[in-house]
Amino acid sequence: MSASVIKSWADAEDEIPTPEITTNPDGTKTVVSYRLNANGQKVKITQKIKEVKVKEKVHPLIAQRKNWAKYGKEKNTPPGPDTRTTQLGEKVELKLGTSWKEIEKQEEESKEEQKAQLVSTQRIKCRTCGGDHFTSKCPFKDTLISDSTDASNAATPEPADDGMNAPGKYVPRHLRKDANGNMPAKDLKDRDDSTTLKISQLNSIVDEDMLRNELLGRYGPFQRAIVVRNRETGESRGFAYVTFATESKAEEALNDLNGKGYHSLILHLEWSKKRK
């Protein structure tokens, strides 16, 4: 490195020699060049270069197309695309073979794992109405069961008390008498549902918040509002149960909304239990 400092860049162009290229016996080339650094000092750079030829095997037709004579604005240009006249598209890799079956299988397995994780982290859901409580504590358990069992209960007479106590006959625990000879209280049957309405023909997009805030907002407050959902998919089954604060509010909602349209469907409102 030279210690002299060049004061003028114009003088530097005259003093910097041209690069020297020397061919070595081993086939490499030694290139000696000079340049100026940030301090204006002349720096000597020595590079040893080895030329390597890489042969690429392509289809004969592809090699033939590369040797075609170019025309128009590309006339007399070297082989290959010119970025001044050619816009390069996205590179697409085409993989041929049977490995795509294995890839699809791996994707399906990953989806199954995600579903399993989702089920494991899912919140508590009632198997009867789909609400966020235990099935044994479902407030509408007797109502939902009665919808499907009313016909069978009407055709099947209740067994007599004497038959219950007949020796050798099994009596369910909930039908056995206690130590004082009294039958157990039927809490669900005796529960007061005088302020509960069943709303059917609901659109599948309707949830509990839409019931409270949109459809029944002016009839609130509510003790509970539950949209009955499918046990497996979690989708709405098209009806819900809403318990109002007073019987008058429930009757007002029944008279105002029964037969009205809501999200492209005609609502049907009725009392959750037949009134005497």
From Swiss-Prot:
PROSITE patterns the record matches: RRM (PS50102)
> Family assignment?
Belongs to the eIF-3 subunit G family.
Residues the record lists as Phosphoserine modifications: 148
- Disulfide pattern: none
SMART domains xrefs? RRM (SM00360)
Q: Which gene encodes it?
A: TIF35
The entry's localization annotation reads:
Cytoplasm
Recorded protein name is Eukaryotic translation initiation factor 3 subunit G
InterPro entries to which the protein is assigned, alphabetical = eIF3_g, eIF3g_N, eIF3G_RRM, Nucleotide-bd_a/b_plait_sf, RBD_domain_sf, RRM_dom
Q: Which SUPFAM superfamilies match?
A: RNA-binding domain, RBD
Entry keyword annotation includes Zinc: no
Q: Which CDD domains match?
A: eIF3G, RRM_eIF3G_like
Keywords of the record, alphabetical order, are: Cytoplasm, Initiation factor, Phosphoprotein, Protein biosynthesis, RNA-binding
Question: Per the UniProt entry, what is one GO biological process?
Answer: translation reinitiation
Quote the cellular component terms of the Gene Ontology held in the record. eukaryotic 43S preinitiation complex; eukaryotic 48S preinitiation complex; eukaryotic translation initiation factor 3 complex, eIF3e; eukaryotic translation initiation factor 3 complex, eIF3m; multi-eIF complex
Q: How does it assemble?
A: Component of the eukaryotic translation initiation factor 3 (eIF-3) complex.
Q: Which residues form the RRM domain?
A: 195-274
Pfam family of the protein (one)? eIF3g
The cross-references to HAMAP family, in alphabetical order and at most eight, read: eIF3g
- Molecular function via GO: RNA binding; translation initiation factor activity
Record's function text: RNA-binding component of the eukaryotic translation initiation factor 3 (eIF-3) complex, which is involved in protein synthesis of a specialized repertoire of mRNAs and, together with other initiation factors, stimulates binding of mRNA and methionyl-tRNAi to the 40S ribosome. The eIF-3 complex specifically targets and initiates translation of a subset of mRNAs involved in cell proliferation. This subunit can bind 18S rRNA.
